[in-house]
């Protein structure tokens, strides 16, 4: 990854314009051709530097206003299997293993999004049934101060 790739990533992280020539402005700013922009983006995607290109949906604007961080006490020897099962649920947007602490037994964290808090609770029940994990707690968000992806 060279300096031009880094500059290109900084440009596209704010979104790609919906126009007939979406990469023209990037090419102009970088002093390269549109085809080189496309080629570089393809190479960055192949190298795993860009996961995918997709629309970013404002979930609150379409009515998905409830979200809960679910914390799960998963036996260490089951963490891989259980984590993979939880990650398959479409309502789960994040699934992370984290360390346990003396007064905190939970080691797997998921973010569940749905239309209502009750729907989030139902998703947690389905996850519990699918994994056999019964020791869990949900924390519902009350207010969002910031939400963004990683920025360069």
From Swiss-Prot:
It catalyses: siroheme + 2 H(+) = 12,18-didecarboxysiroheme + 2 CO2. Keywords: Heme biosynthesis, Lyase. Its EC number is 4.1.1.111. One of its GO terms (molecular function) is lyase activity. Coiled coil: none annotated. SMART domains: HTH_ASNC (SM00344). InterPro entries: AhbB-like, AsnC_trans_reg2, HTH-Siroheme_Decarb, NirdL-like_HTH, Tscrpt_reg_AsnC-like, WH_DNA-bd_sf. Pathway: Porphyrin-containing compound metabolism; protoheme biosynthesis. Binds heme b. The redox state of the heme b modulates the activity of the enzyme. Activity is stimulated by sodium dithionite. One of its GO terms (biological process) is heme biosynthetic process. Pfam families: AsnC_trans_reg2, NirdL-like_HTH. The keyword Iron-sulfur does not apply. It comes from the Archaea. Forms a heterodimer composed of AhbA and AhbB. Involved in siroheme-dependent heme b biosynthesis. Catalyzes the decarboxylation of siroheme into didecarboxysiroheme. NCBIfam families: Siroheme_Dcarb_AhbB. PANTHER family: SIROHEME DECARBOXYLASE NIRL SUBUNIT, TRANSCRIPTIONAL REGULATOR, ASNC FAMILY. Belongs to the Ahb/Nir family. This is Siroheme decarboxylase beta subunit. The gene is ahbB.
């Amino acid at each position: 990854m060279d300096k031009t790739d880094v500059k290109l990533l900084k440009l596209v992280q704010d979104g790609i314009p919906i126009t007939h020539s979406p990469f023209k402005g990037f090419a102009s700013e970088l002093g390269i051709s549109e085809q080189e922009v496309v080629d570089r983006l393809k190479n960055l995607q192949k190298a795993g530097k860009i996961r995918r290109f997709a629309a970013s949906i404002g979930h609150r604007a379409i009515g998905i206003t409830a979200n809960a961080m679910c914390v799960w006490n998963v036996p260490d020897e089951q963490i891989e299997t259980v984590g993979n099962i939880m990650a398959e649920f479409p309502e789960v947007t994040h699934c992370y293993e984290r360390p346990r602490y003396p007064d905190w037994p939970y080691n797997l964290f998921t973010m569940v999004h749905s239309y209502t808090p009750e729907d989030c609770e139902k998703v947690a029940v389905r996850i519990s049934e699918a994994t056999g994990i019964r020791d869990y707690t949900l924390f519902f968000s009350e207010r969002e101060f910031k939400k963004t992806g990683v920025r360069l």
